[in-house]
Amino acid sequence: MAGEKAEKPGTKEKKPEAKKADAGGKVKKAKKVKKGKPHCSRNPVLVRGIGRYSRSAMYSRKALYKRKYSAAKSKVEKKKKVRVLATVTKPVGGDKNGGTRVVKLRKMPRYYPTEDVPRKLLSHGKKPFSKHVRKLRASITPGTILIILTGRHRGKRVIFLKQLSSGLLLVTGPLSLNRVPLRRTHQKFVIATSTKIDISGVKIPEHLTDAYFKKKKLRKPRHQEGEIFDTEKEKYEISEQRKVDQKAVDSQILRRIKAVPQLQGYLRSVFALTNGIYPHKLVF
């Protein structure tokens, strides 16, 4: 009996340990957070990049209007603006004058102009077109072969000479190779290739400016008595100065082109895209 009594307290002591273990296990289970199953998008895709519902429709479908957004508090303290007084109260003498009067600090002008004169507004740093900064793409340097994308010479390869004061590019074919004369073009409408020619020794006339290439207005014929149907429109003719300048520039460049094999054929060829050729994958 004594042995049996000794065993009973031992069994009683084990029970609280088991309870403690169970309690600890329950605590551990409570810490675990069940993750929700990921569901598919509420906006089914019709075509790649285009969903069935619009942005405003998804706003109501997701009930985003129930969410409360709190703006982050800025740490910078706002300076209180000092209000400028528009009026001042001044004491006034006399028994029947009320004692004070409200006087405006900024008084209206006594006299007004009889005619409305337009007021000149400040430009706020705006500069005229002549004073704009002319930037040039890093890939376009003197001697770079460009591909023209617009105009009557589109697809042809030309040689870049210099940038004019207006920002336009001065290019030449040369004329004897691809029938492109000395002309101006915008850098937006050209593709710069990796092929280049050394034109450091080429002397370009200084009078080749924007005024030189500016289109001259042709005079319209005036109708006179008896010459209503006989009048002819004045046609544009290339000046002798242009022909001289074209030969002077091309003669210097042709020497350098002939020194490089297969460059003449490259400048004569016209750039075009065919089936299976993608411009964004080409290396110019």
From Swiss-Prot:
Matching entries from SUPFAM superfamilies are given as: Translation proteins SH3-like domain
Identify the Pfam families for this entry: Ribosomal_L6e, Ribosomal_L6e_N
Tell me where the cross-link Glycyl lysine isopeptide (Lys-Gly) (interchain with G-Cter in SUMO2) is found. Answer: K5
Entry-annotated residues carrying Phosphoserine: S123
List every position bearing N6-acetyllysine. K235
* Cellular-component GO terms for this entry: cytoplasmic ribonucleoprotein granule; cytoplasmic side of rough endoplasmic reticulum membrane; cytosolic large ribosomal subunit; large ribosomal subunit; nucleus; postsynaptic density
The UniProt regions of compositional bias labelled Basic and acidic residues, in chain numbering, are 1-25
Alphabetically ordered keywords of this record: Acetylation, Cytoplasm, Endoplasmic reticulum, Isopeptide bond, Phosphoprotein, Ribonucleoprotein, Ribosomal protein, Ubl conjugation
Task: Name the residue ranges with Basic residues bias.
Answer: 26-40
Does the keyword Acetylation feature in the UniProt annotation? Answer: yes
Task: Give positions of region: Disordered.
Answer: 1-42
Signal peptide residues on this chain, from the entry's feature table: none
Which Gene Ontology BP terms does the record give? cytoplasmic translation
Instruction: Tell me which residues bear N6-succinyllysine.
Output: K90, K203
- Its chief place of residence is cytoplasm
| GO MF | structural constituent of ribosome
- Where is the protein localized? Cytoplasm, Cytosol; Cytoplasm; Rough endoplasmic reticulum
Family label: Belongs to the eukaryotic ribosomal protein eL6 family.
Q: How does it assemble?
A: Component of the large ribosomal subunit. May bind IPO9 with low affinity.
| Function, in words | Component of the large ribosomal subunit. The ribosome is a large ribonucleoprotein complex responsible for the synthesis of proteins in the cell.
> Could you identify this protein by its name?
Large ribosomal subunit protein eL6
Gene field: RPL6
